[in-house]
Amino acid sequence: MGSALLDAWLNLKLYSFDVIDPFNFKNLNKKYSKNKVKIFNKTPTQSEIKKYDIIIFAIKPQVANKVIQQYKNFEFKKNSVIASIIAGKKILFFKRNIKNAIQLVRVMPNMPALINQGTSCLIGNKYFTKSNQKKINIIF
């Protein structure tokens, strides 16, 4: 789902994207190198994470605990939002596992969203700002 959504987002030409995927790094790098998408094979550092306005977790639920632990102690910008499309993982999962995350949103896209024709359900925590809600609405 993550790759398909990225394809749809690239067609919007509104944002630039970086992808972190240690498991599929080579294939993604080959696929997206012409689209100016930066592909990384390791978790960003604390200083690198501060450059992101939106962090989207689009991973399989069975690896969620392992992946999220790598972000556990990061300090995020106050206006950054962490979005998740991980099946079955509620906002509380992120609140418990990423202690410095402030703005959180759970997104449930449907398949037509992959071609910018669908609807997505968003639920954010109480800190999820209207400004970030507009950004998330645009990409989902």
Predicted regions, residues:
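Rossmann-fold NAD(P) dinucleotide-binding segment
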Residues: 40-99
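Residues at the starts of beta-strands that form the adenosine-phosphate
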Residues: 15-17, 81, 103
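Hydrophobic alpha-helical segments typical of transmembrane helices
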Residues: 5, 24, 63, 90-93, ...
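NAD(P)+-binding Rossmann beta1-loop-alpha1 motif at the extreme N-terminus of oxidoreductases
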Residues: 1-50, 117-118
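Internal alpha-helical scaffold of NAD(P)-dependent oxidoreductase catalytic cores
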Residues: 48, 93-103, 119-140
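Short amphipathic alpha-helical segments
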Residues: 6-7, 30-32, 68-71, 94-97, ...
